[in-house]
């Protein structure tokens, strides 16, 4: 009876969120001095040992597929997690597993694995095979679900697929990805899937964002988060720190309001 009580208590301890996608989920917002030393209140990261640890930037540090640690920055996960903790009063566990420069096809179940590069990846990983994005998302999410209920799958990706020659078929690929992910995690449609638009000043945003906005026609229990009014770094690809913070609040508000 005692073991059962401890197990149940552990499973109810955290609200768990799977945070996946490409560079804007990994984070490219520039840090403020306190970001990398001050833990977020009530927010935890699933570490490389599968344990919850206090969340300190960069939040994508424990991703098993990430690019080099120096490339990681502030993402929407920062304010999203803070907001969800403030609204619920419960501890939030982020399962961060994003990688910059990745296409939707590279996230599909069974997609061919690629290799780490020799530029922006950690030197100790150069030319090694990168673990399957899909398999690692499932594996790490399951590890996180040992500590609480999976509350949402939080996604930001699309820049790599926004070119006119790549945009066709994106929604059907995303639909398959979400269906497989929910199935393999054993959660079905009860767990929301949340996706946000790319930087509004990006040259491909006028075509990509309206397409993604119709996500509800493709994926049950899914929400689109508008990026309108948000600003980017000088590269016009990545959201700046201030906009990442606002974006995360929009994600949290949408999830809390169910729309």
Stretches found by the model and what they are:
Residues 11-259:
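Cell-envelope and extracellular/periplasmic
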Residues 3-13:
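Bacterial Sec-dependent signal peptides at the C-terminal "C-region" and cleavage site
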């Amino acid at each position: 009876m005692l073991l059962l009580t401890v197990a149940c208590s552990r499973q109810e301890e955290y609200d768990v969120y799977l945070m996946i996608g490409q560079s804007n989920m990994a984070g490219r917002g520039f840090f403020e001095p306190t970001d990398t030393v001050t833990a977020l209140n009530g927010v935890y990261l699933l570490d490389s040992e599968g344990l919850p640890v206090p969340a300190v930037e960069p939040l994508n540090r424990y991703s098993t597929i990430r690019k080099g640690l120096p490339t990681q920055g502030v993402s929407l996960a920062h304010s999203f997690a803070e907001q969800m903790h403030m609204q619920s009063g419960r501890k939030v566990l982020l399962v961060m597993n994003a990688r910059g420069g990745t296409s939707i096809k590279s996230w599909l179940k069974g997609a061919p694995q690629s290799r780490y590069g020799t530029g922006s990846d950690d030197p100790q990983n150069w030319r090694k095979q990168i673990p399957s994005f899909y398999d690692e998302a499932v594996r790490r999410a399951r590890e996180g679900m040992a500590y609480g209920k999976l509350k949402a799958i939080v996604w930001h990706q699309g820049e790599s697929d926004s070119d006119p020659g790549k945009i066709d078929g994106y929604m059907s690929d995303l639909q398959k990805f979400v269906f497989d992910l929910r199935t393999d995690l054993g959660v079905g449609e009860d767990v929301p899937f949340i996706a946000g638009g790319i930087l509004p000043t990006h040259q491909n945003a006028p075509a990509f964002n309206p397409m993604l906005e119709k996500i509800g026609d493709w994926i049950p229990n899914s929400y689109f988060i508008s990026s309108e009014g948000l600003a980017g770094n000088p590269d016009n690809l990545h959201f700046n720190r201030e906009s990442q913070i606002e974006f995360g609040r929009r994600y949290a508000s949408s999830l809390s309001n169910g729309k």
